[in-house]
């Protein structure tokens, strides 16, 4: 069941435009009829409402161990934009273990905004024996971006959004370091830390010659909302 929290004196709104300069350059503007202002408006609307916690994940998915969750792998052949002749591809993470919050993911293209629907058949569950309902009702926990960093024959993992507002990026001839966060709230306080999370993403479909990828994100939590723009 979902639960609600009373609003604080002010539910704060944060708005960020971030350029991840690991291997791409920042570009301004968009050819699509959706942009940062749209996300900021949604964040304002959320900030004006009482926070509502998402419904709980199925118990069997909550109970997955680290290794069991790792055994649920997205099938590479089901990657978004695979076979479309585009420089980027998207792969997705399954909910479970510590990654229990639902994340909505959309593609922004010339036709508008289209939700990328979760499909359990896009995943290999390995040795896990989940009920069909739990698997299909899971939804996404996050996603990763692939791009040919070193050779045109292979698309490397270059950016990951998974868990709360955590993300990490990888450039050519680099190794992953610590993850970054979109926002940290009440860190190291006796009252306990609050973990805002990215509830929804909008990813612009790239052109066949694109060298950048634009991602918008909406953040939400008990005391804050946020709008973000990432350009790789």
Where are these regions (language model features)?
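Bacterial N-terminal signal peptides
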Residues: 15-27
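Boundary at the C-terminal end of the N-terminal hydrophobic targeting segment
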Residues: 30-35
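Solvent-exposed N-terminal domain segments of exported/luminal and surface proteins
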Residues: 41-189
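Extended, loop-rich substrate-binding clefts of extracytoplasmic carbohydrate-active enzymes
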Residues: 172, 176-231
